[in-house]
Amino acid sequence: MALLPQIVQSVDKPVIAAGGIASAKLVKAALSLGAAATQCGTSYLCCDEATTSDLHRTAIKDPQQHRHTAVTNVFTGRPARGIVNRLISEIGPIAAQAPAFPLASLAVTTLRAKAETQGSSDFSSMWSGQNASGCDDVSAETMTLRLAGV
């Protein structure tokens, strides 16, 4: 959030703060620094309405597993942050040999599906930001009210 005030002063468009915002306190801080809104994506991954798989939810809630995230292109061909697993570790987070979007997701589909039937998330895309501390098994409405400080 250190750059947020400078960005707000430098542009003439509304700024949406994102990255690590997982509590009402952080939402309030971003708004007080000039953000027009906040984006709190990871906080919603364990909400009742989310289609996040059980393997993904387990990884998000496991502090040992979730401690390691990386920006990777191996699942989609485009960079996105996810929990580090076997595929990211062995191929590397950003791999020149990863197929371009949207072909990369097709390349791992069979491997991912087989591993998941065996209870393994080694080849699954488990998208997540660096701060999963706000994730909880609640409704999206409850999460929104919590983040709003209501």
Question: Residues of each region from the PLM?
Answer:
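Conserved active-site-proximal phosphate/metal-binding subdomains
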Residues: 2-16, 22-150
